[in-house]
Amino acid sequence: NGVRNMFGYTGTYKGKEVSVMGSGMGMPSIGIYSYELYSQYGVEQIIRIGSAGAYAPQCNLFDLVIAQGACTNSNWASQYNIPGGTYSAIADFELASKAYQVAKEKGYPVHVGNILSSDIFYNDQPEVWKKWAQLGCLAVEMESYALYCNAAYLGKKALCILTVSDSFITHQETTAEERQNSFTHMMEVALELI
């Protein structure tokens, strides 16, 4: 807890040790924390949980979204100097498959697919999300792409499990209280992956 004032806590779940901590907001924050956890603290897998805005009509408030892949409008992967290319950031297949199975067994509405990790929260082009939706992105958040890139680069595992907090299609949204008190299904699924 003495590094960067981003507090982490370690306990046990069903007899297995598990650590939890915040990841900040956006790719720069999770990029720093995940890189250091993987490279300096021996962490082998990171499961990020968080909220997302739905781009797909089948994704309703409180549904889970397992980010099988993460697209981005960021230049995060430019650091890898891939000549003429972009990097497709994906989740660890084993973690994603197990998360899907756990969610189904628990009866939680769950969707699996691509999401958008965006650098932009308040977009000056309010309709741009439709282009990402047309390409099959289920939802938008701000961290998964950087986490998946760091995991791939360092030979580690990563997964993002999201809860739909609002919809770009219906304009429905959860309240701050609902986000604080009701987003527990993704936590339950994540804990079963330990």
State where each predicted segment sits.
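Glycine-rich phosphate/pyrophosphate-binding loops
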Residues: 49-53, 154-169
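Active-site rim beta-loop-alpha module in soluble metabolic enzymes
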Residues: 85-134
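Metabolite-binding pocket within alpha/beta catalytic cores that recognizes anionic/polar moieties
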Residues: 1-97
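Glycine-rich beta-alpha junction loops
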Residues: 53, 116-121, 146, 164-167
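A C-terminal functional module that forms or caps the active site or interfaces directly
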Residues: 126-159, 163
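Generic non-transmembrane alpha-helical segments
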Residues: 98-106, 150, 189-193
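His/Asp/Glu-rich mid-to-C-terminal helical/loop segments that flank catalytic regions of hydrolases
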Residues: 168-194
